[in-house]
From Swiss-Prot:
A motif ('HIGH' region) lies at residues 54-62. Belongs to the class-I aminoacyl-tRNA synthetase family. This is Lysine--tRNA ligase. GO terms for cellular component: cytoplasm. Its EC number is 6.1.1.6.
Length: 551
């Protein structure tokens, strides 16, 4: 178990009333558990579980499962007024055989001899003090979860099987072998049906996890008989970690053995959920409540895989954004497939701070639907962010700032009184913005020269900005920019109306400004950018573009 404690809960009549009506998905899921025990009354302890396959390093999907489950757990605590104990078990399937050598490990050839051996018996290729591949990856999972302060209990399949904690249920699986086969065989092809067994013996000679047919299953003795790899008939007890279950029966067995009440899993498990449930019931358990989430996709729209190492890692996200933004991305639309790559970070950061600033002004019923209530377990901090992350990225781009001090020069002029000391959240974002810009924006920046119409527009904009005093508000600057665009036929949008009743302004005008002046296709509100960067500085940028010094 980790040293982290569950977040403190302060129950008030307002919170209790709002929770009863809350529509946010963690509350909807928590109500399933209440309904589960509506007739019998709630047990002393409710068990939440998440699973982890340590075939590769943990990725954000792994983290997200724990984060989301923790949100449901917290909502459940509120709905039950914290009168029911809860546990969150993070279970690692580290007795599974290594089916292939992962792509993202050093010296792949050195692991080839260990194919089909339990992951906890495969040597650790990463170096350090960890004895096995699984022990290393399990430690990485716990490190990630500890970083975020989750309260959880880590459980290892290897330890549970070998210590005998699953023995009672495994002996029941031998007794009910025929019932399990009746569930499994219809799900298999004809060829596989002939050799399938829910039991996977671990060869006493080679140490490999064997996919072999059973010659005998002895319910009375609690043993299975099979031919080992060398052809010798072998009998093993199903207890003590000598035998494990195939992954589908294993899922249901674990639920029965641990008494799991709630588990979420990815859409790739959805078609098998009924199988897991039935196996759990055959083994004397009650199937838990489920929540099926959509899978994250990489930049190419492919499913993120632990063994491929595609997508983005937890550490990579945290190099460019605060931890809360990552938790927000996991909270949002869990039933929608979302791309998980570096380009989603700036928008997510700004959304987090937008939700955070709104929280204090909201009534309780709206607070419980605000993601920050769930991210911070009902106690979000106060934070005022006078400059958005997207705006900061444009400021770095225009100013070529390489140090936080340069950016703070612009920020403190724009927002007097704000300093790194009195706004540490903003100071952290300054560092993130510089790093993100250098790694992702700068390499793709591409300025273009303006055509004749665009040159005239830029000259008119320069003149208009020259009429405004230093320190002019961003909204006033934005309106001045719009006035320039409305007078140019190319940028008139007749589907929109200006305040005076004339045509509105096409987004192509702002796209032109960003392409010519910043070297990017889009950006935040241009008036806000000018207010932050400075009117004189923006006019100097326009002059550079007109002189051909940017493209």
């Amino acid at each position: 178990m980790t040293s982290h404690r569950l977040p403190e809960i302060t129950l008030t009549p307002e919170l209790t009333a709002a929770a009863a009506e809350a529509k946010a998905w963690p509350f909807e899921e928590a109500r399933k558990i209440l309904k589960r025990y509506a007739k019998t009354g709630l047990p002393e302890t409710v068990i939440f579980e998440t699973g982890y396959g340590p075939s590769g390093l943990p990725h954000i999907g792994t983290f997200g499962e724990v984060a989301r489950t923790s949100m449901v757990r917290h909502a459940f605590r509120i709905l039950t007024q914290d009168k029911v104990k809860t546990r969150l078990i993070c279970f690692s399937d580290d007795l599974d055989g290594m089916r292939k050598v992962p792509d993202n490990v050093p010296d792949r050839a050195a692991l080839e001899p260990y194919l089909q051996m339990p992951l906890s018996s495969v040597p650790n290729p990463f170096g350090g003090d960890y004895k096995s591949f699984a022990e290393h990856n399990n430690a990485m999972l716990c490190r990630f979860l500890d970083t975020f302060g989750f309260d959880y209990e880590f459980a290892s399949a290897t330890e549970y099987y070998r210590s005998g904690r699953f023995d009672t249920v495994l002996l029941k699986a031998v007794e009910r072998y025929d019932d399990i086969m009746k569930v499994m065989l219809p799900t298999l092809g004809e060829e596989r049906q002939a050799t399938y067994s829910p039991f996977l013996p671990i060869s006493p000679k080679s140490g490999r996890v064997l996919y072999v047919p059973m010659k005998k299953v002895d319910a009375k003795a609690g043993t299975i008989t099979f031919d080992d790899e060398d052809g010798e008939e072998t009998t093993l007890s199903v207890t003590g970690g000598k035998v494990k279950l195939q992954w589908k029966p294993d899922f249901g067995m674990r639920w029965a053995a641990l008494g799991v009440d709630f588990e979420m899993f990815g859409k790739d498990h959805q078609t098998n959920a009924g199988i897991y449930d039935r196996i759990c019931e055959i083994l004397g358990g009650r199937a838990p409540e489920h929540f099926v989430y959509e899978l994250f996709l990489d930049q190419l729209g492919q499913k993120i895989s632990k063994s491929k190492g595609n997508g983005i890692s937890i550490d990579e996200w945290l190099a460019y954004a605060p931890t809360e933004s990552l938790t927000l991305y996991n909270f949002q639309k869990p039933k929608t497939a979302k791309k998980l790559y570096f380009d989603v970070i700036p928008k997510t950061v700004d959304e987090y701070f937008t939700y955070l600033s709104a929280y204090a002004r909201q009534e309780w019923k709206d607070r419980l639907n605000n993601p920050v209530w769930h991210i911070h377990y009902g106690n979000p901090p106060k934070a005022d962010l006078p400059v958005t992350f997207a705006l900061m990225l444009n400021l770095v781009s225009a100013s070529n700032a390489e140090s936080p001090a340069v950016l703070w020069g612009f920020i403190s002029r724009h927002v007097p009184g704000v300093t790194p000391e009195n706004n540490p959240e903003l100071d952290a974002l300054v560092g993130y913005a510089i790093r993100y810009f250098n790694d992702f924006v700068k390499p793709t920046k591409k300025f273009r020269a303006p055509d004749d119409v665009e040159r005239a527009a830029l000259e008119a904009l320069d003149a208009k900005l020259g009429e405004l005093p230093a320190g002019t508000d961003g909204n006033v600057i934005q309106n001045a920019i719009l006035d320039v665009a409305r007078a140019i036929e190319r940028y008139q949008d007749h589907t929109k109306k200006s305040p005076e009743g004339g045509p509105g302004v096409s987004v192509s005008f702002f796209q032109m400004l960003y392409e010519v002046l910043i070297g990017q296709e889009r950006g935040p509100r241009f008036g806000s950018f000018v207010a932050l960067y400075g009117i004189d500085e923006t006019r100097a940028l326009i002059k550079k573009a007109l002189a051909g010094e940017l493209a």
